[in-house]
Curated annotation (Swiss-Prot):
Source organism, top-level taxon: Bacteria
Protein localization: Cytoplasm
Gene behind this protein: thiI
Known function: Catalyzes the ATP-dependent transfer of a sulfur to tRNA to produce 4-thiouridine in position 8 of tRNAs, which functions as a near-UV photosensor. Also catalyzes the transfer of sulfur to the sulfur carrier protein ThiS, forming ThiS-thiocarboxylate. This is a step in the synthesis of thiazole, in the thiamine biosynthesis pathway. The sulfur is donated as persulfide by IscS.
Protein name: Probable tRNA sulfurtransferase
Gene Ontology biological-process entries: thiamine biosynthetic process; thiamine diphosphate biosynthetic process; thiazole biosynthetic process; tRNA 4-thiouridine biosynthesis
Amino acid sequence: MQYSEIMIRYGELSTKGKNRMRFINKLRNNISDVLSIYAQVKVTADRDRAHAYLNGADYTAVAESLKQVFGIQNFSPVYKVEKSVEVLKSSVQEIMRDIYKEGMTFKISSKRSDHNFELDSRELNQTLGGAVFEAIPNVQVQMKSPDINLQVEIREEAAYLSYETIRGAGGLPVGTSGKGMLMLSGGIDSPVAGYLALKRGVDIEAVHFASPPYTSPGALKKAQDLTRKLTKFGGNIQFIEVPFTEIQEEIKAKAPEAYLMTLTRRFMMRITDRIREVRNGLVIINGESLGQVASQTLESMKAINAVTNTPIIRPVVTMDKLEIIDIAQEIDTFDISIQPFEDCCTIFAPDRPKTNPKIKNAEQYEARMDVEGLVERAVAGIMITEITPQAEKDEVDDLIDNLL
């Protein structure tokens, strides 16, 4: 027998009252995006559960994808069979022969939404339980916490059988908590920050600063690959590439070395905030971890934050590096993050950056530059790409292939 569909149960949606259907519709769309790599799979959702109809797709691969989608409490693979007692009996026997091992206990849990079916739930439990005893005479029944709980559901159109419940990712459907701009470098921390924001339902757009020729096409592709890894948790993500070369050269020419990192981060924050405003975001998200590097002291954060009143979410701010690495490995971003491509935060990094920068000093150095013009030109030059779970070969890939 082959699975016909996957029955999906919701996570925290039960607490959402009148907004429940909005959350469900968002989750359905997210599941559809994530499963778009399986062309034959179709997704539907109602108030109580969602269904992914396999239509011949490989169940194992689809299940692995579903495990990552935020908003799913658990799911069960389902067999669809003809709605007749004899077919149900033979199907139950076939399933039990496949999965039963010596010493296992079982029970049958039946329910019916089709009340015209010839047996009620109690009678169906007894009839199908008897069929199991015919197939496996020594099997034991256990009503509480059996090894096998074979669930039977009689609906209008057919009967459905399942015995396995697989834990989902939990959390909230991506997009139900509003939009945030993720400052995505190519490092370990920012993808983890993005993942944690996604888990709480934030629809992220990835803002990446590129400084060609100082940063390479490989660095850009690395950031896009990290973004693609994050799409498996809630669907497509907008990747926003910001041209940053002019600003970095201006900072390098007109500011003391100790303040290069502070000013660089202040410009990044301004630009991200401007993009957020244009694209109707609510917050900025970054991968800062307190004390990990010079730009992540409380004094530095204060000096950098001073350019915006927008809330800054720092999901990894209290984590040790090893804790962040553990999550990066779990979500499969670590190996990409450690690829040896320079990002724009490292190319002009000073040997001894200021760890307690003063806002008034930063403002004094910025007065030497056309801050507003630099920001406006950077925002005007952004390039937006929709990143999907399935990689598509593009010009950057071709260029990398040629270089290699």
